[in-house]
From Swiss-Prot:
Family label: Belongs to the chloroplast-specific ribosomal protein cS23 family.
Lineage: superkingdom: Eukaryota
Protein species of origin: Arabidopsis thaliana (Mouse-ear cress)
Alphabetical keyword list: Chloroplast, Plastid, Ribonucleoprotein, Ribosomal protein, Transit peptide
InterPro entries: PSRP-3/Ycf65_sf (IPR038447), Ribosomal_PSRP3/Ycf65 (IPR006924)
Signal peptide annotation: none
Assembly mode: Part of the 30S ribosomal subunit.
Name assigned to this protein: Small ribosomal subunit protein cS23y
Length: 183
């Protein structure tokens, strides 16, 4: 039996201009909800209304990209009357982000006479930790040095080693075919 958790967060905001008096009700309401299910994606729904109008609801699948709001917005923690909880009971809402696993990434420095290749351990919420210095091609055999380093790390899977070495090969080949020029 599968268990689904439904978390959502709500935010209201009001627009204000010098000639406009703020009302006690928000003019727009944004609700972000996610279902913790492997195949689902977070969803965003936005309601906008004027006093005396029925809210128009818009939704989109991917809320990852937001435009910056105009500078004349005032944020409010009030909920519209239809969504406010009864007195004495407060609804608590939590937004849960899925956990990302740490991963090993390939970094490179593209120069005119050399290309540098290095490995970093990327830890979500913390940053990156360098696993190797930059190995430069064609001064030394950067691919062989990278392979030796990857083999010395038993916690990196064989499949991921092959993937990283293939990426390094592709980058070195691209650098060689372009003669070091990006243009």
């Amino acid at each position: 039996m599968a268990v689904q958790a439904n978390q959502s967060a709500s935010f209201g905001f009001r627009t204000a201009s010098p000639s406009q008096k703020l009302s006690s009700k928000p003019i727009a309401h944004i609700s972000l909800s996610t279902k913790l299910k492997p195949s689902s994606r977070p969803s965003l729904s936005c309601s906008t209304w004027n006093q005396g109008q029925i809210p128009a609801r818009h939704s989109c699948i991917n809320p990852g990209i937001f435009a910056y709001p105009p500078s004349n917005l005032t944020f409010s923690h009030e909920l519209p009357e239809s969504e406010s909880p009864p007195l004495g009971k407060k609804k608590m809402r939590v937004l849960v982000k899925p956990l990302e696993k740490p991963k090993v990434v390939l970094k490179f420095v593209w120069m005119q006479k050399d290309i540098g290749v290095a490995l970093d351990h990327m830890i979500p919420g913390f940053g990156t930790i360098p696993l190797s210095p930059y190995y430069f091609w064609p001064r030394k055999d950067a691919w062989e040095e990278l392979k030796t380093l990857l083999e010395s790390k038993p916690w990196i899977s064989e499949l991921h080693r092959v993937f990283l070495l293939n990426q390094a090969t592709d980058i070195i080949n691209l650098w060689q075919s372009s003669g070091g020029d990006l243009s």
